[in-house]
Amino acid sequence: MASIVSHVAVNNRFAYTMTKGAVHAMTFAIAKDHIHEGIRCNSVSPARVHTPFVDDYLSKNYPGKEKEMFKNLSQTQPLGRMGQPEEIANLVLYLCSDEASFITGSDFSIDGGFVKLNGN
């Protein structure tokens, strides 16, 4: 699992960005090295996804303002909301299926338009 931060710069995320960039490099290397063995490798780069981590972060860092901050974070996405874990899972399931048998060495942004539509 990669992240959109490997596509766009985000303040104060040096180590996280570097590790997600490494996931991309690993994805491409595995795809190239094992293509003749029938092994496919792709990466998925989500943007903000509404998980319990987000709720916990907001409650710890913005007590009493969780709803306001959640709304603010959601509005940074061009679609106006965070992704849902099931949406990420559906993409991963597709990439693992035979229906995606012609896809390898690719990264898939699943970000509500964040990378391409935010002017980054």
Residue spans for each PLM region:
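A short C-terminal helix-loop "cap" of Rossmann-like NAD(P)-dependent dehydrogenase/epimerase domains
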Residues: S59-T76
